[in-house]
């Protein structure tokens, strides 16, 4: 099979028939063998009924229906598990992503040998409340991930080589960082294509506003930390703990030495415990010890994890 199209959706009953007809037309013109996998993420409208109706007349339509809303990452993960095409295309169901982009995305994967190609909506028809946070988010994501050629990490329109989606795990809210996940899994040839962005035709945006924006940054930091130190927590916690303990120890030695010098010169010196520096030093030593032990426990967990030797292998003979 040439192409699997994975479409996560939530309350998109009006756009589903039109979107499928558009995809089908593009596939037939280019004579691709294909499947369309709709993942209904707990919709409360008749989205699932529309998918079932389409499947009755089209054996290329497959559906997955969640009992409740789990989020886009969960929907993509299940769609990826079911996909069988040589190239996997993801797109949103709101008709803002154009299926006419599929042939060129397919060509870039198959002929130019990209592992992943992400769409770039250079001209957007979204409100400022969405476009401004998106630009700030993408600038940060480029810096943290090291993928400097991508301008739109969260674009729903992407193309993947099949082995990419079978070797990454999309969870939580990590759908925004699939290129970063792919890079960490060893798929480094990542490209970008400027794609046409259309104004929403039906319904309203499901964008979560500033809350989603800040959550995105927290997810990015979590992913970066896990990538850098997930298998070696002692390197970061042990270092920070040792540094804090050392600074606290030096400070408390200075406090004690100051007291001894005053006594040796016959001067009356206040009690060591009367000095605020004593308590500050003691606090730093305690925190340093706790950080060190956190790193030690993290190292024990990492070394005894079932995934500690989970390595991505390109070829074997």
Predicted regions and their residues:
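Hydrophobic helical membrane-anchoring modules
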Residues: 180-317
